[in-house]
Each structure stands twice: as C-alpha cells, then as structure tokens.
Amino acid sequence: MLIPRKVKHRKQHHPGRTGHATGGTVVSFGEYGIQALTPAYVTNRQIESARIAMTRHVKRGGNVYINIFPDRPLTKKPAETRMGSGKGSVEWWVANVKPGRVLFELSGVDEATAREALTRAIHKLPLKARIIKREEGDA
C-alpha cells in the first residue's frame, strides 16, 4: 500500500476538488495513459487494485507507471459517537485527483493489450477517465 513514510501534521483540512490539473496532464513515461475526466479522491487501496489489474493483464510484457501518490489523510469518527471531542482518527490516505491529470501510464505492449489493461484499471477507480496515447511532441 502507498502511504507517506512521515508527515509533518497527522491530520489535515480536506482539500478542494475544484478546478483542473495544471501539471501531469500529458503522458511522459509510457506510451499510453489514463487521464481523469472528473475530480475524485483516489485511495491507496484503489490505486493498488488498479495497478494489480493492469500488471496481471500485461503479465511480464510491459511497464506500469503510477503518477499519483496518496499524500492526504482523511479522518472519520466512529459510528454512534457524539459530536465534538475533536477530529476523528485517520482512516484513509487519498490522492486529490483533478480533471486532466494522468494517473497511470503503460509501455512495452501493443495497443490492443494496453487498451484492455487500462480499461480494467479504470473500472477499479471512482472517477470517469479516458485512455490517451503519447503525442510525438510530448516530453
């Protein structure tokens, strides 16, 4: 699971999900990628589930690149607890994904295999996404 090794503050305010991604919007490491179309919090378990779905489909053929990291803690209070008495304990680590952000990249496989693997990964994620191909001029 992806979680930060060490954080300065254990609990944070919830980040806003408005606006579009400013960086990480092009495929830079692989040949194909998953680009978010809607904003969402993606948990570390969802990232791991999508990664496993891709790697199992491509077997030993390709390389999978993860471009997001769950660096935000989300807290939750226990069930049937009275209001007050502080903020709840950390339950999940999430990545704040905005539209336009490339989440995963894939290289080393043919286009049909890549599209199927990325489609399987999209089904594991809590957002709408599309598959994009690397442009010639991209870094």
From Swiss-Prot:
GO terms for molecular function: rRNA binding; structural constituent of ribosome; tRNA binding. Keywords: Ribonucleoprotein, Ribosomal protein, RNA-binding, rRNA-binding, tRNA-binding. Belongs to the universal ribosomal protein uL16 family. PANTHER family: 50S/60S RIBOSOMAL PROTEIN L16 (PTHR12220), LARGE RIBOSOMAL SUBUNIT PROTEIN UL16M (PTHR12220:SF13). NCBIfam families: rplP_bact. Part of the 50S ribosomal subunit. Binds 23S rRNA and is also seen to make contacts with the A and possibly P site tRNAs. This is Large ribosomal subunit protein uL16.
